[in-house]
């Protein structure tokens, strides 16, 4: 039997291995105060996206939770898509808000600005767009809506590290832009997240978030410190930070490999409904839509190609179940399939995936 072609596969080199060894031997593995390599990673990422400030955390979920804690959403509404990983909605609930799920544009699977506009009420306080699969949302229209109604934009960029919008990196636009780092993500590390801040009060926001990232600890001098508010144990560890620093150096190159694969898929896969080819996209996911999804996935699995379903719509989960219909999202939730697009794919594997998708779709 052929070795299975993985849906995700991190691209790790010698530098990551060497840096891990240095951290291991140092005995300095974690820092709640965010010194050492964590601070270096924040500074390098800030340069990379061109933002005012960055706060590194231990996951994308933590990033969303902390970012939303910057604005008062208690008993207020936050508009977001239902087609996302469930932590996008969880972060709203954790901060006392109510998630309002709206539909997507079927061409991109990103939130539809027209549906945002229709869903605004006196209780609406924020918009939480998701750059689905690494495809940038229509930020211009979303920003216009936010300005018109005095709403805050918190972006979920868990898929979009290295993507661009208007010739600027994603992470350079919204008040707070939340990234996720994981072995399956474009920037791989054991686990991690980051908030990129773009605001005139970014220094004040950083001070607030540094305390909330480490159990509310503030005013630390040697072993003395104070706690003035609730916080969490959300800081990034040194192992993740050094891997992140190495990954950041080659991120654009690896994303270009993904784009080249996407270009081949776009030209040669005959499925009508698939993610558009766009040089701005980071292609964390390459999705197609098929009617006979279960059979299609089994057929590919039988010949050694791993696939995924990203995602079951959040409003269909038991915890969030809503009676209202979100038509494009629900259709996508039944038909969407993700196929391998990671940089470790060989040309023969890419050709095999294309041939197999065309055969069984």
Regions found by a protein language model. Give the residues of each.
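Conserved active-site segment immediately N-terminal to the catalytic lysine
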Residues: 155-189, 221-227
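Short beta-strand-to-turn element immediately C-terminal to the catalytic PLP-Schiff-base lysine
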Residues: 179-180, 193-200, 245
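PLP-dependent aminotransferase class I/II
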Residues: 10, 40-43, 48-54, 114, ...
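Phosphate-binding glycine-rich loop
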Residues: 31-77, 83, 91-95, 101-103, ...
């Amino acid at each position: 039997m052929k070795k299975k072609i993985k849906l995700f596969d991190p691209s790790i080199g010698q530098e990551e291995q060497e840096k891990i060894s240095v951290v291991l031997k140092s005995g300095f593995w974690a820092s709640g105060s965010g010194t050492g390599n964590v601070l270096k990673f924040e500074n390098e990422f800030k340069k990379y996206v061109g933002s005012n400030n960055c706060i590194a955390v231990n996951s994308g979920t933590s990033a969303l939770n902390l970012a939303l804690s910057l604005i008062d959403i208690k008993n207020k509404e936050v508009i977001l898509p239902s087609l996302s990983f469930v932590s996008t909605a969880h972060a709203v609930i954790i901060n006392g808000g109510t998630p309002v799920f709206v539909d997507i544009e079927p061409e991109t699977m990103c939130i539809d600005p027209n549906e945002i506009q229709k869903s605004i009420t006196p209780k609406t306080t924020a918009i939480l767009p998701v750059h689905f699969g690494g495809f940038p949302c229509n930020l211009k229209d979303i920003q216009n809506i936010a300005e018109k109604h005095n709403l805050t934009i918190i972006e979920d960029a868990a898929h979009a590290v290295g993507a661009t919008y208007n010739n600027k990196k994603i992470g350079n636009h919204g008040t707070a832009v939340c990234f996720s780092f994981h072995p399956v993500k474009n920037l791989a590390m054991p686990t991690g997240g980051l908030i990129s801040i773009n605001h005139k009060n970014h220094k004040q926001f950083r001070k607030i978030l540094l305390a909330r990232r480490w159990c509310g600890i503030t005013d630390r001098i040697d072993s003395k410190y104070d706690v003035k508010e609730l916080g969490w144990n959300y800081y990034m560890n040194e192992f993740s930070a050094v891997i992140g620093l190495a990954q950041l150096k080659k991120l654009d190159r690896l994303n270009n490999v993904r784009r080249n694969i996407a270009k081949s898929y776009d030209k040669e896969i005959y499925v009508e409904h698939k993610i558009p080819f766009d040089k701005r996209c980071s292609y964390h996911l390459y999705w197609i839509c098929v009617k006979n999804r279960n059979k299609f996935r089994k057929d590919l699995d039988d010949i050694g190609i791993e696939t995924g379903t990203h995602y079951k719509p959040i409003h269909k989960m038991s915890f969030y179940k809503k009676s209202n219909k979100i038509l494009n999202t629900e259709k996508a939730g039944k038909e969407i399939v993700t196929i391998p697009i990671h940089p470790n794919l060989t040309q023969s594997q890419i050709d095999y995936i294309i041939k197999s998708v065309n055969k069984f779709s």
